[in-house]
Amino acid sequence: MKKFALGVGIVALAIFSFLYIQLYRVQSTIDEQLAQQNIAVQSVNLSLFPPALSLKNIKTTQFSVQKLEAKLNFLPLFYGNAKLHSLNLQQITLNQNAQNSANISMDLAPFSLNQLLSQKVMLNGESHIRIEFDKPIYGNKTFNFTFKKANLDFSKSKSALIQFVDASLNNQPLGYIETHADFTSPRQQMVTYIKPQCDNDCLAILKYQQIDNQSAVNFSGKYFPVKRLFALLNLPEVLSGHADFNIDFTFLHSQLIQGKLNILAQNGEILGVNLLDMVSQYFPINYNGDLLQYKELNTRFEQFYLQLFLQQNQLIAEKIELKTPALLGQGKGIIDLHRMECNVDINLHSTDQRYQNLALPINFFGNCSSPQYKINFTKKFRHQLIDAIKEKLR
């Protein structure tokens, strides 16, 4: 029995010795990579139980990280091929002038530890990234990002190429994403192309530029799915269809100080509002069968144009223009981004030439996803309605 216990102890000691030798080799490889790429690190620590790697105060020409923690798979250590499956980065900033930092946690498809500090990293398999910023970006501090494949190329000291396949942000599918980054001091620029799966060719382009404490974002696109666009902008889901859009945001010390949005949605629906049903109660119009079949909970439209600007926690709709097969509309309103409440005034006209002078004023208020409404029966509207009825009876 003593011999058996002694044998087990010797085997266990041999295994642990072998594993620690493997860890020493891993650390030697990491130290070599850090030296080759001129990456400054305060300390590098490896542990066996649980298998993990920790680096403190990492500094490169492109970014800095206060602390990096990587969890390793245990079994691959026996073969001398350390693989990591999760990664945590604390207080990462893109350059010394950056006004915002982030904590990033990643659950990754297992990949070789040798790639962690290499200039080119390729990931294959479902991966999840959670990003939490120190300061909110457009009202959000936390972003959840997933993808199935990724290519990260940092082989050039002042630029980078990042590609994702089957990507999704905050549960919104974005498809293929490609980012070109320029870290030339003192200016920092990034251009990102987003190409989701669409019925027709659709594309969005995100441009970011930072100089000192100021930064600017331009987000534009063609035939982009409206629901995905509104979700990315943290706007209430009130429209469907596809949109051409151009959006400009200006930041100071990472705080959003100015925003302008122009969105032209086409061939979609206003969700949760049936304008045709509302109007049919007041307009002396006979709707044909083709129009009545769409009398459901939504309003089908051909075009919906929004011109908005950001004012503190509100989006001010300077101009709203609507075109449906039966109606034309013009209006303006306010969206409270904290409460997700809307207050919109819109005047509806018939597309019938005989009733162009009749404008039905409607006020929508309350929850943007299921608003209440009231008809503003002004003296002007009453006179217009009487004139329209007289015209119809002639």
Residue ranges and their predicted role:
Residues Q37, T61, G80, M122-L123, ...:
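Extracytoplasmic/secreted proteins and extracellular or luminal domains
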Residues L393-R394:
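Short, solvent-exposed mixed-charge patches
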Residues A52, K56-K59, L84-S101, S105-P110, ...:
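Small-residue helix/turn framework positions
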Residues I15-A98, I362:
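Terminal hydrophobic membrane-targeting helix
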